[in-house]
Amino acid sequence: MLVQGTIICALVANAIASSIPSSFLLPEPSGPFKVQREILELTDWSRKDINSTLPRRLMVSRFNPIPEKHCIRTEDVPTFPPASAKLEDAILQAASGGHWVDGLLAASRIRVCADVKKGYQTDSHGDNHGIPILLFSPGGNTTRLVYSSIAQTISSAGYTVITMDHPHDTDIVEFLNGDIITGGEVTFSNPSVLPFWNDVRVQDTVFVLNQALKTSPHARIGMLGHSFGGSAVLSSMVKDGRISAGINFDGGLWGDAVNTGLGGRKKPQPYLQWGAYTHNRHNDTSWETLWKAMERLHPHAWKKELGIPAGRHNTFSDFPAIIDAGGVREVIGKASIDVLVGDIPAARSLEFIKVYVHDFFQFSLFGKDEGLLRGPSSKYPEVVFLD
């Protein structure tokens, strides 16, 4: 029976894999800019890597907004390099009880600006053309690559977005020369290790920020993070005042910043936390602790909390876009889809994430009106405000 069952499962898996196209395009960004993607390897010579005598190396993706008139040619490129796609597919297969579609990540593509007019430099004039730089820290044990569509969508609204991998934390980091560092060292079943790994992310963030500011020393800086990356946002803002504003996408908080909060500097640092499904500060002790600390220590500091009751934790990732563009919602099955991404279509979630992120950073980095952050909008009923 075991052999027969294995054969049947293999046949089903092969049928499912053959049902997806050899490649499919993730949603094209809806903003006014085309987007260029640069894959960069950065070496921090001032730090040793974890349990190593070698300097710490990072991989980042930099998404640059390019005015349409300066983009000569677009190209559809793989979202994931081969080894990353293979490992992440295997992890998703195991986590979903076999309901994930093998080969889905390898088949995904994003459309990028592949050729920019000569003379247009993305980091010229020392201020990145007045375009803010947003740093993005991914979820725990999660590659930056599963935020490519979200980063590209935000970038298309007029932001340089830099997504970061955190080696030994991230499931897999694939370097330009083919070197691979696998992760999984951040164990959420052992909370005592999380402040350490949170601090590693903060150090990575400060290093990447320093590199970005070498060519754009006057650029305005913000930060976003999902899940464990959301904790890195708060801690990085407390550590480095150059980060003027930040958004935490559905992440629990770790480290001393929870008890100090933001608002102790002369320069304001607006902070937005955005939960999904039932997650909010009334059921997350770390969020509540931060809120009370800021109300006590910095009562005038700008902070707000949003929610997406119909969303899921992975609404703030590319999983909805990958599933919808790959046409596999029905293949994966309603029960698994409900847990993984919920019912909100990717096109819709990408749109409201983009516009709320845009209004927040226009307000916090440029002093414009709060826009959608003023309160509930009939145009985006999925997004709720918590008192």
Curated annotation (Swiss-Prot):
It is found in: Secreted. It catalyses: a 1-O-alkyl-2-acetyl-sn-glycero-3-phosphocholine + H2O = a 1-O-alkyl-sn-glycero-3-phosphocholine + acetate + H(+). Residues 1-17 form the signal peptide. It comes from the Eukaryota. The keyword Phosphoprotein does not apply. Glycans are attached at N51, N141, N283. GO terms for biological process: lipid catabolic process. Its EC number is 3.1.1.47. One of its GO terms (molecular function) is 1-alkyl-2-acetylglycerophosphocholine esterase activity. This is Probable 1-alkyl-2-acetylglycerophosphocholine esterase.
